[in-house]
């Protein structure tokens, strides 16, 4: 702390921290009346800082005290006593401040931020610090206004900071190529196995034990045979009967190995070929031509009707015993002939009148489980 420049004021330095203000007043009071004694203390600890200022009422007393007391040992320490003076660089009545620049000049020199250039500000202390791994470190150069600071690049932060976007991309590419051969075992297995394969295809590739020795038509027959067992539950029977019969016809065509004895002479395939080609147009109700043309050939229909029904019943009974089903329902071919008779009465086919006599004799002689066709129709 600088005091006002007065002729009777002296500076006393090099004091012991145990020296008190009252002791100084008593010692220097021998040279003349003392007007004021100031012992400089620390603001926080309140301890002596080792120097003091003393003011005499007369300037001549101050000069005598400087001559007599300079270099004297006081409380074990040699003290320095001299005339207190204000520094020549400062004006009277103003406080000591560091040299300053103008605003424009300070701002132009301080606010410089670049990779190669540095700030040239020469005023005020600088405070450097790393901002948590960033590549730029603030360099606070306080000017006279205290508002400007410069930011310069820290060379160590370039190495310690996060990599740039280009370097991160190249590092990621190198890591992908390097780790391609060291992927986990789980991903290798999943890459070899097919993705998104439905459960049905896997079930077809690995059939159950009950499917051994059967072709794809066998599985088709098992699925369609369920529709055949539910045959008696439908009220509209024409389309369902034709669909089920066509499925069974395809099934018998694929059973060459297991049912070779039925295909020898009286099978469905030979009987079907003896019926001839199709000559009748499709009916108005969407009937199947294959079933309508069974009645167009009188020789094939009348001559081979009974063996056909006996063979068909034997085939269906053996098929159901093979698939493990206990219930046996009437074959769809008999139902088709029965529907053909009903169509004749309603007049759907133009050629049905030619063979009405043969169909009547056939339907009267044919029985299912000991019940004539007409009584069976009434029961349904």
UniProtKB/Swiss-Prot annotation:
Protein name according to UniProt: RNA-binding motif protein, Y chromosome, family 9
Superkingdom: Eukaryota
Biased composition (Basic and acidic residues): 180-190, 333-351
Pfam families: RRM_1
RRM domain span: 8-86
The keyword Lipid metabolism belongs to this UniProt entry's keyword annotation: no
Originating species: Mus musculus (Mouse)
Tissue: Testis-specific.
Any one GO molecular-function label of the UniProt entry: RNA binding
Keyword Metal-binding attributed: no
Record field: compositional bias (Polar residues): 166-178
Function noted in UniProt: RNA-binding protein which may be involved in spermatogenesis. May be required for sperm development, possibly by participating in pre-mRNA splicing in the testis.
InterPro entries (UniProt xref): Nucleotide-bd_a/b_plait_sf (IPR012677), RBD_domain_sf (IPR035979), RBM (IPR050441), RRM_dom (IPR000504)
Subcellular location as annotated: Nucleus
Matches recorded under SMART domains: RRM (SM00360)
GO terms of biological process kind: mRNA processing; RNA splicing
Gene Ontology cellular-component terms listed: nucleus
Additional information: The RBMY1 proteins are encoded by repeated regions of the Y chromosome. The exact number of functional copies is unclear and may vary between individuals, and some of them may represent pseudogenes. Overexpression of Rbmy proteins in mice carrying the Y(d1) deletion that removes most of the multi-copy Rbmy gene cluster does not have any effect and fails to reduce the frequency of abnormal sperm. These results raize the question of the role of Rbmy proteins in sperm development.
Chain positions covered by the region annotation Disordered: 82-226, 279-358
Annotated keywords: mRNA processing, mRNA splicing, Nucleus, RNA-binding
């Amino acid at each position: 702390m600088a005091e006002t420049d007065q002729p009777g004021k002296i500076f006393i330095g090099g004091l012991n921290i145990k020296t008190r203000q009252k002791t100084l007043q008593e010692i220097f009071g021998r040279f003349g009346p003392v007007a004021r004694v100031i012992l400089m203390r620390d603001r926080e600890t309140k301890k002596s800082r080792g120097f003091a200022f003393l003011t005499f009422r007369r300037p001549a007393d101050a000069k005598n005290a400087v001559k007599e007391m300079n270099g004297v040992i006081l409380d074990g320490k040699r003290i320095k006593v001299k005339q207190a003076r204000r520094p020549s660089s400062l004006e009277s009545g103003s406080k000591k401040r560091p040299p300053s620049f103008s605003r424009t000049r300070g701002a132009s020199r301080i606010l410089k931020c670049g990779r190669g250039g540095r700030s040239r500000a020469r005023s005020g202390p600088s405070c450097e610090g790393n901002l948590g791994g960033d590549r730029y470190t603030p360099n606070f150069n306080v000017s006279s206004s205290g508002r400007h600071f410069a930011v310069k690049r820290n060379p160590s932060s370039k190495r310690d900071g996060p990599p740039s976007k280009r370097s991160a991309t190249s590092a990621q590419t190198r890591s992908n190529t390097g780790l391609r051969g060291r992927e986990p075992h789980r991903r290798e297995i999943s890459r070899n196995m097919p993705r998104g394969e439905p459960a049905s295809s896997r079930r077809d590739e690995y059939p159950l034990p009950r499917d051994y020795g059967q072709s794809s038509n066998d599985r088709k027959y098992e699925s369609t045979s369920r529709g055949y067992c539910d045959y008696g539950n439908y009220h509209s029977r024409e389309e369902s009967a034709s669909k089920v019969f066509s499925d069974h016809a395809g099934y018998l065509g694929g059973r060459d190995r297991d049912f070779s004895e039925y295909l020898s002479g009286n099978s469905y395939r030979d009987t079907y070929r003896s019926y001839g080609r199709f000559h009748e147009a499709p009916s108005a109700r969407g009937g199947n031509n294959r079933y309508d043309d069974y009645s167009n050939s009188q020789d094939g229909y009348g001559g081979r009707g009974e063996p056909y029904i006996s063979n068909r019943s034997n085939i269906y009974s053996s098929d159901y015993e093979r698939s493990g089903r206990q219930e046996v329902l009437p074959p769809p071919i008999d139902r088709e002939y029965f529907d053909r008779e009903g169509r004749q009465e309603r007049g759907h086919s133009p050629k049905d009148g030619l063979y009405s006599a043969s169909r009547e004799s056939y339907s009267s002689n044919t029985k299912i489980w000991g019940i004539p066709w007409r009584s069976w129709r009434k029961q349904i």
